[in-house]
Structure formats: C-alpha cells, structure tokens
Amino acid sequence: MAGRKLALKTIDWVAFAEIIPQNQKAIASSLKSWNETLTSRLAALPENPPAIDWAYYKANVAKAGLVDDFEKKFNALKVPVPEDKYTAQVDAEEKEDVKSCAEWVSLSKARIVEYEKEMEKMKNLIPFDQMTIEDLNEAFPETKLDKKKYPYWPHQPIENL
C-alpha cells in the first residue's frame, strides 16, 4: 500500500524551484530534504504488516488465556481510515483555475495585439519636434481643445488643469 501511494504523490522539484522566490530557496531545500527523508522511510515499510505468530506466544506465555484474549482483541481491532473529502474539492478548484488561466491568457493575447498596434502607431508618428498642433491633435485626439464646449481660454475644464 505504501509503495502504490508513493508513486502517486511525487513532486516535480525542478518546476517547484523555478516558481519560488530567491529568498525562500533555503526553506525549499529544507522541505525537499525532509520530503526525501519521509519518502525513504515510507518506502522502507512493507505493504502489509508482518503476521503475528500466535502459536509461538501461546507456547511461551505462562498465563493460558492471556494470548487468546490478545488475539481476539487484535483481530477485533479495526483502524478507521478517514474518508477523503477534499480531493474532489481540490480537483474542482484546479479545473476552475485552469479555465480562469486560459481565459486570462486569451485576454492577455488580445491586449498584446492592441499594444502592438499602438506601438506601431507610435513608431510611425512624425517626430515631435517636427509636429504642428494639427498633427498632434490628429495623433492624440484627447489633446484637442474643445472651443464649443469651453469657449473661454484654456478651453478645457478647470479640473483638468
């Protein structure tokens, strides 16, 4: 049992080392060594515990009913294994995270396309020292003064000054 569970719970330490900050490298190496220690201890355990030789104890224990009593109690003992109620929740959260990451990546790619268009527009601009006011207003419409809405100088709201 220990060997089968161990194969499922491996950690990709190279990927883990890439995502942790530089100031936490010592903590991560400590965690890795502790994990390796526990993994080796768990791997050393047999899959099933060794069987108890009750006949040997019955022959060598002086009190007659003591071994029979222990055997009955030992066979009646059932260690409850807690149910795993969090794995399904973690898997569901992982699926949601994958969806949100994919959505974020697609939105980021769209933003990158917009920013590349804007960069291309900036590269194709007339140099600022050669621009006229009309060229500036054409390239950047937000700089144009609105003389109809604000007929008095500075032709923009006081809050923007």
Swiss-Prot record:
**Quaternary structure?**
Component of the ATP synthase complex composed at least of ATP5F1A/subunit alpha, ATP5F1B/subunit beta, ATP5MC1/subunit c (homooctomer), MT-ATP6/subunit a, MT-ATP8/subunit 8, ATP5ME/subunit e, ATP5MF/subunit f, ATP5MG/subunit g, ATP5MK/subunit k, ATP5MJ/subunit j, ATP5F1C/subunit gamma, ATP5F1D/subunit delta, ATP5F1E/subunit epsilon, ATP5PF/subunit F6, ATP5PB/subunit b, ATP5PD/subunit d, ATP5PO/subunit OSCP.
Give me the gene this protein comes from. Answer: ATP5PD
One MF term from GO for this chain? proton transmembrane transporter activity
Ordered alphabetically, the record's keywords are:
Acetylation, CF(0), Hydrogen ion transport, Ion transport, Membrane, Mitochondrion, Mitochondrion inner membrane, Transport
Read off the PANTHER family from this record. ATP SYNTHASE SUBUNIT D, MITOCHONDRIAL (PTHR12700)
Localization terms from the record: Mitochondrion; Mitochondrion inner membrane
Which family does the record claim for this protein? Belongs to the ATPase d subunit family.
- Role: Subunit d, of the mitochondrial membrane ATP synthase complex (F(1)F(0) ATP synthase or Complex V) that produces ATP from ADP in the presence of a proton gradient across the membrane which is generated by electron transport complexes of the respiratory chain. ATP synthase complex consist of a soluble F(1) head domain - the catalytic core - and a membrane F(1) domain - the membrane proton channel. These two domains are linked by a central stalk rotating inside the F(1) region and a stationary peripheral stalk.
Q: Which residues carry this modification: N6-acetyllysine?
A: K32, K63, K72, K78, K85, K95, K117, K144, K149
Identify the stretch annotated as signal peptide in this record.
none
Gene Ontology cellular-component terms listed: mitochondrial inner membrane; mitochondrion; proton-transporting ATP synthase complex
InterPro entries for the chain: ATP_synth_F0_dsu_mt (IPR008689), ATP_synth_F0_dsu_sf_mt (IPR036228)
Can you name this protein? ATP synthase peripheral stalk subunit d, mitochondrial
Q: Tell me where in this chain the PTM N-acetylalanine is found.
A: A2
One Pfam family cited in the UniProt record for this chain:
Mt_ATP-synt_D
Which Gene Ontology BP annotations are present?
A: proton motive force-driven ATP synthesis; proton motive force-driven mitochondrial ATP synthesis
